[in-house]
Amino acid sequence: MKLKSVFRSVLKYRKTNLSLLLLITYSIITLLYIFDHERYKLNLPKEDEHPEFNDLLETAWGDLQIITASFHPYTSKENDKVHDYLLKRVLEITGNSSFASVSDDKESERSILFQQQDPFNESSRFSRVTYFESSNILVKLEGKNPEEEGLLLSAHFDSVPTGYGATDDGMGVVSLLANLKYHIKHRPNRTLIFNFNNNEEFGLLGASTYFNHSWSNLTKYVINLEGTGAGGKAVLFRTSDTSTAKIYQQSVKENPFGNSIYQQGFYSRYVRSETDYKIYEENGMRGWDVAFYKPRNLYHTIKDSIQYTSKASLWHMLHTSLQLSAYVASNSLDTADQTPACYFDFIGLKFFVISAKTLFYWNCIFLLVSPVVAIGLYLISRDRMTWKSHSWLSWTRFPLSLAAGIIVQKLFSNDIIRSNPLTFSRNYFWPISAFFTQVIFTSYVLINCSNFFFPCADMKSLSIIELFIILWTILLFTSKLLYSSDYRYTGLYPLSIFFLLSTIAAILRLLALALGMRTRKRLGRECRDHHSNYSSHSQIDMERDGQENLEQPQDQFTSSQDDQASIQDDNVSTTSAGPSHNVDEDHGMDSSSQQHDERVPLLKGSNSMEEGLSTRENSLKLEYTDYAWIIQFLLIVPIPSFILFNSVDVIMDALNHTVQEGSKATFDVLRFGMVGSILMALPILPFFYKVNYITISLTALLFLISASKTLLVHPFTNSNPLKVRFSQNIDLSQGNAASVHVLGREGNFLKPMLQDLPSIKYSSTHINCTSVTNGMELCMYDGMQPNLLSTNGNTNISSMVKVHVLHNNRNSTERSPYEPIVAELLLDVKENRACTLTFESRHQAKSPVREITVYQKKNSAPQKTNITKTIKSASGINELQLHKLDFDQETYHIGVQWFPKLLTDGNLEDDKLGTKDELSVSISCYWGEYDSESVVNGTAVRKIPAFDELINYAPLSFSFTNEQKGLVIVKDAIIL
């Protein structure tokens, strides 16, 4: 009996037990979180256990060190060195293999001219034409069964001008080399193509060029390796459909990492980046986009270097891609299910996949069946008189306390916006923690205040039922979203899991009521509200000498019945579950209770029905209901809390640094934090009113710490810097001033930093800072002149870009007024690889340009030839982007054809000034090398000293990236 008493004391529903269980639950969630984020670092292959994998990793790490020795954007000479190194490594690996072939676009002088939607801005209506000279390196491994659809493995080897490209995309490139080395030794069944492509950063151009190669017809599937962050684990960022997600599930058995929440966020454009996977997907390929995704404030900066990453990160991407490619290369694939997939991993141990369409069907079943079952059980309990109606005050406590918590949260978010809107960039834990504790603390205070004045015994069960109703409404809304998005809202699955588990908990309570003992007379009220018509003077005695009242199992379902103190502490009144009787262990009904309670039946035979129930049946009910609160807790709290916490962490981990990219992103992150914290709080709210004073004191303390950290701590540090975008602009049409543009978030960050630069501080240079769109600030000042060329005389910036008009028949008398106008331009640009031409007419709303021609010089042996590429567009062409490989070829030869105004609007008005058909052409040319020197008059000087000054003198809480495809932009303009 003593052991039984101890056992019952440990498991009964009281404050200490609940608080301890909450502590255990959140401790386990924390340990799982740490395990998930640290485990991959311990799984490096050992030479004695996995010599082949160890060799692949060590070789890849060495390749990465060489590739990332310097900045190597497409616009730099270092880009050619990386290309040549990769070509050498590819030839070394393939050797004399009989089934391997190598194709070098640079050697074959492959180029394309095509019309391109802005890949980084799908909403853009700007019509763009792109000319690109490729230096992709392709390798074909012919499979044993070449008739099977092939697999493409792709990564880009260019970096941005301001980053070494260790994770973007050096790790992807060396992982491809490792995959190539592995598959050379283990010949695949299906054909594999490896695409080491160039110039992903400024238009996804290497991937676009792939489809100009004959080998592109051999591949149906693609594994794209990318870096949109700067380290950590490589995530399955997105995948084509349920079939490809299941292939990942079947292949990546060690350390799988993926979540369809990333996929939904990426497609919803919460992340302003793109990868080559977009191009492959648009061209009908199916596959997997595996990428590094954090931290974004180091992405595209000088800290994207080998110093800020690790072998563990490299091995995670390499091993993931190797498992996936080996499986796809050697197995027949079931690809029938092409609906979008919902997927997630459990701490890197297990990967789960379900079709989003299937999830929608299950949601519909849940939405239809659960209320039917709940209402049915409610009607049964009403019929059996085991359900007691509750006052409106009892029913409104939980939703009103939740609403109050949301209001408090909203007020606090206003304080964040006013005082520290970028706090998420430094550490999203503190604002999320503040939001979370606000909701649960507000709920605790309001519910307990209500219970003090108007006690409610079964608050927990009422809250669980109301939680079920709230989640049913949420699931209805999210299911509608899922359906209307053609099942592409793949990040909503946590709500389905939460709803299912909370529904089971609510149904269990209703089932217990429905199966409860029938009574003819209710002897008490479950909720003794202030508005009761009468009050009960009977006192319930739930336990005497360890014996339980067998006539009230439903009371034990919801609260402790072990001693009088517990009853008073919990505000217990047993009529919620059915009849309430005071039972003496020897004499049944207490005589004094019968004498003083006028509600006691006058006829002794009135309880014959209850007495007729078998002792075995009552014992079984008692055994089931005694610990039901624990079952409810285990259903509602641990699993939903872990899934929701992990989901919120996934979202914030990927998006918290996007607050630096504009006010819209800031409000998005703030909104996600608020909604996420509410969802994290929902599982514990039905129980939290019951916690002990230590728990609620710790909650209040955590809120105070979190709020102070959120509102008062500076958002940027050395490890979490503010990313600022740099460019130096020289507009030749307005002089030779080298105007430095520094773009970053508003908030008095940029100007104080710039004012401390020596060139500004000691020369009284004026800094002009203005607000631009989306909460960004642009600061401009005249900086030091760049030294882009080596020269023996004075550097003349105006000689960097010269425009020659070779032909223009706009004013020719031989041209009919209805005939398109034709002009030819020769751009003389020194040591350059990228220029952009923008076309505009002052007299026409849309660009009148309908045709572009690029005259290309071919240097292939045996003799040079001229190639003409032409593209036409009926809707008009706004922009021509030019990318060439040869630094020594100093000219771009362009042909432009545009319609006169007469053809576009039919207006026959006189043009006395002869200007209505003029075409304005703006030219911008880009240089991206800054970490190198030029020799001017025999002296070595830095190419872009203005950028060097920022790097050297700005506080460590700033990091810098390029604003455009080059760090220096020289502009000019002409009128044709």
Swiss-Prot record:
Disulfide bonds: none annotated. It comes from the Eukaryota. GO terms for cellular component: vacuolar membrane. Binds 2 Zn(2+) ions per subunit. This is Vacuolar membrane protease. The keyword Transcription does not apply. Its cofactor is Zn(2+). GO terms for biological process: proteolysis. The chain crosses the membrane at residues 16-36, 360-380, 393-412, 429-449, 462-482, 497-517, 628-648, 669-689, 693-713. It is found in: Vacuole membrane. Residues 37-359, 413-428, 483-496, 649-668, 714-976 are vacuolar. Residues 549-558 have a biased composition (Polar residues). It is a multi-pass membrane protein. The lineage of its organism: Eukaryota, Fungi, Dikarya, Ascomycota, Saccharomycotina. The active site is at 200 (proton acceptor). Belongs to the peptidase M28 family. One of its GO terms (molecular function) is metalloexopeptidase activity. Glycans are attached at residues 96, 121, 189, 212, 217, 656, 768, 796, 811, 866, 937. Residues 582-601 have a biased composition (Basic and acidic residues). Zn(2+) 1 binds at residues 156, 168, 226. The record marks 299 as: Transition state stabilizer. The keyword Cell cycle does not apply. Residues 559-570 have a biased composition (Low complexity). Zn(2+) 2 binds at residues 168, 201, 300.
